[in-house]
């Protein structure tokens, strides 16, 4: 079982990043791959969670130990798998908002996450309420990882962001509903498009 990895980012896709260390490239699923676009060929440290299946061995990466702990709490809930847990974490810039929703039993807020219905939201509250307070300090680490990549062409960056939303589990209908809002941002980076898209999704 892996605890963390330190290596260079060599590839970024809507679904995962590749981190190379000692001549081996590790495919790692992260909540927002484009956060690492500005880290290409730079050493980073990710805390890892490994999922072993009959047909695959999957790695999920997190910028801080607190993020990893939050992810493990989420996937302990019946109905939330690793992909859903990662999508939930990607959908909120402030994980404190997620924690507050659970503590406040805000089912409406929780059902805004992709793949989370009323039953799963209620299960999240039942299983996690009162158990997440120690994780609220994780946001500083998330903010520190914000990429400073050069601006790519608007169409390419926007297309990458929309593809990343699809990878997180949002439907075509949901994505189309916020596309005009993203276009109104003008030319910017994929990470900025995606971060704003996730905020728009949570406000719908």
Swiss-Prot record:
Residues 153-204 are annotated as: Domain III. Residues 64-143 are annotated as: Domain II. One of its GO terms (molecular function) is four-way junction DNA binding. SUPFAM superfamilies: DNA helicase RuvA subunit, C-terminal domain, Nucleic acid-binding proteins, RuvA domain 2-like. It comes from the Bacteria. Its main location: cytoplasm. InterPro entries: DNA_helicase_Holl-junc_RuvA_I, Hlx-hairpin-Hlx_DNA-bd_motif, NA-bd_OB-fold, RuvA, RuvA_2-like, RuvA_C, RuvA_C_sf. The keyword ATP-binding does not apply. One of its GO terms (biological process) is DNA recombination. CDD domains: UBA_RuvA_C. GO terms for cellular component: cytoplasm; Holliday junction helicase complex; Holliday junction resolvase complex. It is found in: Cytoplasm. Residues 144-152 are annotated as: Flexible linker. Residues 1-63 are annotated as: Domain I. Keywords: Cytoplasm, DNA damage, DNA recombination, DNA repair, DNA-binding. The RuvA-RuvB-RuvC complex processes Holliday junction (HJ) DNA during genetic recombination and DNA repair, while the RuvA-RuvB complex plays an important role in the rescue of blocked DNA replication forks via replication fork reversal (RFR). RuvA specifically binds to HJ cruciform DNA, conferring on it an open structure. The RuvB hexamer acts as an ATP-dependent pump, pulling dsDNA into and through the RuvAB complex. HJ branch migration allows RuvC to scan DNA until it finds its consensus sequence, where it cleaves and resolves the cruciform DNA. Homotetramer. Forms an RuvA(8)-RuvB(12)-Holliday junction (HJ) complex. HJ DNA is sandwiched between 2 RuvA tetramers; dsDNA enters through RuvA and exits via RuvB. An RuvB hexamer assembles on each DNA strand where it exits the tetramer. Each RuvB hexamer is contacted by two RuvA subunits (via domain III) on 2 adjacent RuvB subunits; this complex drives branch migration. In the full resolvosome a probable DNA-RuvA(4)-RuvB(12)-RuvC(2) complex forms which resolves the HJ. Has three domains with a flexible linker between the domains II and III and assumes an 'L' shape. Domain III is highly mobile and contacts RuvB. Belongs to the RuvA family. This is Holliday junction branch migration complex subunit RuvA.
